[in-house]
Amino acid sequence: MQFHLSGFHPGDPRIHNPQARVVAPPIKRPLPSHCDVVIVGCSPAGLNLAAQLSQFRDIHTVITDLKDDRLTVGQADGMACRTLEMFQAYGFAEQVIQEAYGVNEVAFWKPDPSDLSHIARSSKIDDVEEDLSEMPHVIINQARIHDHFLNVMKHSAAETEPYYARKLIDLTVDHANEEYPVTLTFERAVTHSQFNREVETVRCKYAVGCDGARSQVRKSIGHELVGDALNQAWGVMDVLAVTDFPDIRLKTAIQST
């Protein structure tokens, strides 16, 4: 079933009334002074880990994020087959498949040899090789994946919910403290990402940085991002296209002249 006919709107698309889809804003509450695990960042990796740990009532997990609230518009949308297999373990793979667009084929276009001012389809292949997985490759807004993880967390044994509007200032490790060796210091926002000097401190056994490429966790422990960068210009657009391009609903690679 196609849910999003006129662009993406946050919330569960099975709820027809857009106003009813809106989730209540998070309750403002102080961070605990001590816990077992602190996850910095409500990224997909952070929410995945929080959802796993939330299944255990005796593990006190805290997850924080810089944003004021849950994600409403995502920054990515591709879900690989293996990712859906993981979602199946959480119990929401089928709902993702129902909401998502299935990528079944890849079409390749290149300049038409008979008229280089035009392009022509040169070939088509299956998007997923045979017997790779029982799950499909799909496209769905990242915000919906966050919603599903948050629902798993909220209804889990530990009833875990994120602490939003927290900016990590510092992380230190005291090896002499065997019970709670890690200390994290956060600055708390008062209104819409306007941070002041209201500081909160949490001591924990383990801290996990899921706060992206410019990770403050990584910086605090003295590490640097190791990897290569490509000197390539590229972009991503999220548009409602009015077009007569025949493969608009396929994953398509177009080679220009």
Residue ranges and their predicted role:
Residues 1-37, 52-59, 178-180:
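Extreme N-terminal leader/targeting segments of oxidoreductases
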Residues 4, 9, 72-155, 159, ...:
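Active-site-adjacent segment of FAD-dependent monooxygenases/related oxidoreductases
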Residues 33-35, 192-206, 210:
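Core beta-strand elements of the Rossmann-like FAD/NAD(P) dinucleotide-binding domain
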Residues 39-41, 50, 87, 146-149, ...:
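Conserved structural-core and active-site-/substrate-pathway-adjacent residues in large, well-folded domains
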Residues 46-47:
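N-terminal Rossmann-fold NAD(P) dinucleotide-binding loop
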Residues 51-77:
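Glycine-rich FAD pyrophosphate-binding loop
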Residues 151, 206-257:
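Conserved FAD-binding catalytic core of PHBH/FMO-like flavoproteins
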Residues 165-169, 189-190:
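Conserved SAM/SAH-binding loop
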